[in-house]
Amino acid sequence: MWKISNENDIFKKRKPLPPKKSEESQPELTPWQKQNQEYLKKQAEEAASKGENEQAEVTITLQEQSQEEPQQHLPQETVEEEEHFADRLPNVKKTRNKRLYRRLAFILTCLGTAILVALYFVSPLSRLSEVTVSGNKSVESQAIIQQSKLETGSGLWEQYSNRNYFSANIQKKFPIIKKANIKLNGINSFKIDIQEYQIVALAATKGGYHPILENGKTLAETTKAAESGKPIFENFKEDKLIPELMASYNKLPQEIKQGISEIKYAPSKTNKDLINVYMNDGNRVIVNISDLSEKMAYYSQVAEQMDKPGIVDMEVGIFSYPYEKESEETGSEVSEDSAVENQEVVDPNAGVATDGANNGTPTNGENQEVQQAE
């Protein structure tokens, strides 16, 4: 039960009405006025009862608030700080432990790695144990290993870091080797992958046949017999001619390459770039080295129009003719050349026909020519 301090404050007595005047002095009220007075009385009574109820509610509310004031007046920030600090304390410990574990793991990892590296370089695993070769066809594997200068038993990684140097040693010693790639094979061994140039032709010399590589280089080694399927190059005495020829030859279609049996260097007095290309079908092509790849592309069309084997002249234009015509032209050219070369010089003092090359000394053949001329 809540204690009410002053009942008079809550339940106020209604003020006394002013003394009524005597009935004689007051006029008689009409029915309407009587009803109005009764209505006003009811309104006043209702207002008084309503005010008393509101005052009681306000008093009860104030008493409840007075009991709650000790708790409400406590500093809110202090309570919140105590709660937050208590909640954060376990998290702070966990974070510190995680950092310590991470640092410890990092230190142990670095230390363990350093120990393993030191043990590796001390062990035989850090030394080259074996070298193998693959892809070689023309050069023996042992010769490649020896010329590479790789040393088994020496440091593996030191030699691997200088692998370009060892590859260059191989290519320098063996021109046929196009590329030598040194790579790791297993834990402590090397593998040398070899790529060789193709032998595309043979250079004919007095001592035999020298292989000609696709890059135009001629190997020093010789073979007594010509390899089948490879064209033979003849009369190429100058070293620069074969690389120039190979630059054009490599551009030819494979069908044309397979149809070539021999290429001879045949310069004329006016053209030092001429070659004769002998085909397997019996034809002979006269063409410039610089025009070989361009004009030989039309050879198949020209050969189909020829009735029998002959000559395809591609020096200036492109035309063909049989071998008989060449023999006739060659005979006339030879007779003209011999007449010019055998032209006689007459010595007026001696009265004898002499050859300028013999310094005025007549020969039996010259005497016969002089007599015939007379």
UniProtKB/Swiss-Prot annotation:
Domain POTRA stretches: 126-197
Main localization (coarse): membrane
Q: Which InterPro entries match?
A: Cell_div_FtsQ/DivIB_C, DivIB, FtsQ_DivIB, POTRA, POTRA_FtsQ_type
Key words, A-Z? Cell cycle, Cell division, Cell membrane, Membrane, Transmembrane, Transmembrane helix
Alphabetical GO CC annotations of the entry are: cell division site; plasma membrane
Q: Where is the composition biased (Basic and acidic residues)?
A: 39-53
Q: What parts of the sequence cross the membrane?
A: 104-124
Give the Extracellular compartment stretches of this protein: 125-374
Question: What does the entry give for GO biological process?
Answer: FtsZ-dependent cytokinesis
Q: Where is the composition biased (Polar residues)?
A: 56-75, 356-374
Intracellular or extracellular location(s): Cell membrane
Which stretches does UniProt call biased (Acidic residues)? 326-339
Q: What superkingdom heads the lineage?
A: Bacteria
Function in brief: Cell division protein that may be involved in stabilizing or promoting the assembly of the division complex.
Q: Tell me which PANTHER family the record gives.
A: CELL DIVISION PROTEIN DIVIB, CELL DIVISION PROTEIN FTSQ
Family statement drawn from the similarity comment of this UniProt entry: Belongs to the FtsQ/DivIB family. DivIB subfamily.
Spell out the protein name for this chain. Cell division protein DivIB
